């Protein structure tokens, strides 16, 4: 699969995951300053509303959390993590996840779009999971979202309670909003498209909902 260039660090992360035998991310076939060729992963990204609704169901949540825990554990203590706990993906969401149907069930099989990968803490990606994979928002049931967050944290093995996670979700949402705003202001086409599509307002609504219903 041909695409534009990706950051050098992301290339190193993908190569290290492959070296360690992890097969739930694309393989870098070739990369230079102008373009990158990645292996094709059979399946579909959850880019439609129907698939996104399926992606937040408990079985899918459990499996995608296991995938995140796997690569965190693989890269914990690696040189790429520097002095941080792990290497984080930093853009975990259903459209960046490849799914396949198995016996009629939708299940995640790989993570794509590693452009924002960077050294970080496990909590950073956990916050992304709990924000992007739980269906939170204006029409969401608080009880359902809390149940989904509990499943993510239990599956991951997180034992430090939910409040550090919900506070990290707020930081993650603000960071995403700031990134779009700054990038669009700097003339980046992708961030301008996101801004024009209403991403800033959407993220702010998610942030307001998180504050209102998840932060004790």
Model-derived features: where do they sit?
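A conserved alpha-helical element in kinase catalytic cores
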Residues: 1-74
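Conserved kinase catalytic-core helix
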Residues: 50-90, 95, 101-104, 149, ...
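Short, polar/flexible loop-turn hinges at active-site or ligand-entry regions and domain interfaces
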Residues: 51-54, 118-120, 136-140
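Short helix-to-loop capping/linker segments positioned immediately adjacent to catalytic or ligand/cofactor-binding
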Residues: 75-83, 137-141, 160
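Catalytic activation segment of kinase domains across protein kinase-like and atypical kinase folds
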Residues: 86, 94-129
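Active-site activation/catalytic loop segments of kinase-like enzymes and analogous catalytic loops
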Residues: 125-158, 173-183
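Eukaryotic Ser/Thr/Pro-rich intrinsically disordered, low-complexity regulatory regions
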Residues: 165-171
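ATP/Mg2+ or Mg2+-diphosphate-binding catalytic cores
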Residues: 176-216
């Amino acid at each position: 699969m041909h695409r534009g260039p990706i950051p050098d660090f992301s290339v190193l992360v993908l190569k290290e995951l492959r070296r360690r035998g992890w097969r739930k991310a694309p393989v870098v076939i070739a990369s230079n300053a102008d373009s990158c060729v990645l292996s094709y992963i059979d399946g579909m990204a959850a880019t439609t509303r129907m698939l996104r609704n399926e992606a937040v169901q408990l079985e899918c949540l459990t499996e995608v959390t296991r995938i995140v825990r796997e690569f965190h554990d693989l890269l914990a203590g690696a040189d790429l993590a520097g002095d941080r706990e792990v290497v984080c993906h930093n853009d975990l969401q259903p459209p960046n996840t490849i799914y396949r149907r198995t016996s009629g069930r939708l299940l995640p099989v790989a993570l794509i779009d590693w452009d924002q990968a960077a050294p970080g803490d496990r909590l950073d990606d956990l916050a992304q999971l709990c924000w992007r994979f739980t269906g939170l928002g204006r029409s969401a049931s608080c009880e359902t979202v809390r149940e989904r967050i509990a499943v993510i944290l239990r599956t991951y093995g997180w034992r430090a309670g939910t409040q550090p996670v919900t506070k990290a979700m707020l930081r993650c949402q603000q960071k995403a909003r700031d990134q779009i705003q700054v990038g669009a202001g700097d003339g980046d086409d992708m961030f301008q498209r996101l801004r024009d599509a209403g991403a800033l307002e959407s993220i702010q609504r998610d942030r307001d909902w998180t504050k209102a219903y998840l932060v004790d």
